[in-house]
């Protein structure tokens, strides 16, 4: 139940997040910086949990994710990563 709620929250977050071209985020805003950093950590953790060999998102510095397009690509890849994680755990005995 909790897993489904987390996945639903991430999907809702992705659907409601404004898609505004290549305009950069303001990294001087502590809330924006924390959100970008937490998203990167979540993607990195999910990739490690799924034993992904090539986790390119962990190599990006937070300044690179200031680009909205790059950050949104990372979040779009997060949903399949979480789906894979939950599916494999659900199938496990």
UniProtKB/Swiss-Prot annotation:
Q: Where in the cell is it found?
A: Secreted
Q: Which UniProt keywords apply?
A: Disulfide bond, Secreted, Signal
Which domain of life does the UniProt lineage start with?
Eukaryota
S-S bridge residues:
none
Positions of the propeptide segment: 23-33
Q: How is it modified after translation?
A: Contains 4 disulfide bonds.
Q: Which GO cellular component term is one of those annotated?
A: extracellular region
**Secretion signal, residue range per the UniProt entry:** 1-22
Q: In which tissues is it expressed?
A: Expressed by the venom duct.
Q: Does the keyword Protein transport apply?
A: no
Q: What is known of its domains?
A: The cysteine framework is C-C.
Similarity remark: Belongs to the conotoxin F superfamily.
Q: What is this protein called?
A: Conotoxin F_Vc1
Q: State the organism of origin.
A: Conus victoriae (Queen Victoria cone)
Q: What is the lineage of its organism?
A: Eukaryota, Metazoa, Spiralia, Lophotrochozoa, Mollusca
């Amino acid at each position: 139940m909790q897993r489904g709620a987390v996945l639903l929250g991430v999907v809702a977050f992705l659907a409601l997040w404004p898609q505004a071209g290549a305009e950069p985020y303001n990294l001087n805003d502590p809330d924006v910086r924390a959100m970008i950093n937490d998203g990167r950590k979540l993607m990195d953790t999910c990739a490690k949990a799924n034993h992904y060999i090539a986790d390119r998102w962990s190599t990006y510095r937070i300044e690179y994710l200031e680009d909205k397009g790059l950050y949104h690509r990372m979040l779009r890849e997060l949903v399949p990563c979480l789906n894979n994680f939950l599916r494999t755990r659900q199938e496990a005995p």
